[in-house]
Amino acid sequence: MSTPTDHLVRPIVAGLSGTARTGRALVEAAAAVLPLAWVPTPFPRTAADVDLDFLNRALSRFPARLVDARPVGGTNGTTDRVRLELAWNRDDLDDLPRHVFIKSTPSSAKNRTMVAALALARNEALFYERARSALGPRIAPECFAAHAGLGARHLLVLEDIADRGGDPMALCDDIDAAYARAMMATLGELHAAFWESPRFRGDLRFVRSERERPGFALLLRQFRQVRTKLLKSDEYDLPREVREMAEFVNANDWALHANWERGPQTLIHGDTHLGNSFGLPDGSVGLLDWQVLYRAPGLRD
């Protein structure tokens, strides 16, 4: 039941909640710049810390034991990624994974700061821990272990989609209409699975609206600064329409995001560019990198 003072109380509560989220983001960012070993975790922080005992526990669903795991490639970026080639104590089983993908704490303090402030690692670990099982096998890689701690320290043990014929795409790749249609089918399945889900008030409470995401206020501030810098720079000959739009967005960005939140709520991937997708031999399409997921109308994807 509403009371005559609700219109006064709600903005205050929202402001306090926003301040708390920004405070948490700053604490996370502060922890991120510390040397990795200074913040203890109950899990390996990097692929180099992963040993056979840890992997055997993560892969205990399989009726065999690992006898070796060696890196066969990897990249560093927003997170560190290493592909491991696996050797098992049994050669008579065809369904054992031959590789896994380790996604872990960024080696760069700069990248850790961004990942920590925006809770990107926590988002992805919780997605695989709580939400992944509600989706079909094509939507995302299978996850064997998901851990996240303070200051962007995290580690995921993921299926290597290449082992089932998956083809990760790059931003510069060309696709055809069939790939685009398959992506729409994947997004439809994702959004339908969590459409107005009561789980958003339960185990999926971490899937917040965009404006409630940790660090989002800091992100908007950064975007404003970039637009302001572009507007003041003589280096770019910006058309009048672009200048007017940049000024409008700078003045109204919070209201714009509030308007974009209107409508039926579901879980969205939040970063559906081509480089976060992969194709499968049957023509279906899946999604990688679930760090930016949030709750919104499905059209935002």
At which residue positions do the language-model features occur?
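Conserved NTP-binding catalytic cores of kinases and kinase-like/nucleotidyltransferase enzymes
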Residues: M1-A152, L267, L280-V285
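Conserved protein kinase catalytic core
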Residues: A109, G165-G166, S277, R295-P297
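Short alpha-helix boundary/capping segments
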Residues: A116-L120, L171-A182, Y294-P297
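Short pocket-lining segment of the protein kinase catalytic domain that shapes the ATP-binding cleft
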Residues: L156-R164
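ATP-dependent phospho-/nucleotidyl transfer catalytic cores
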Residues: G165-H269, P281
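Active-site Asp-x-Gly
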Residues: L267, G279-D301
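Catalytic-loop signature of eukaryotic-like protein kinases
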Residues: D271, G275-F278
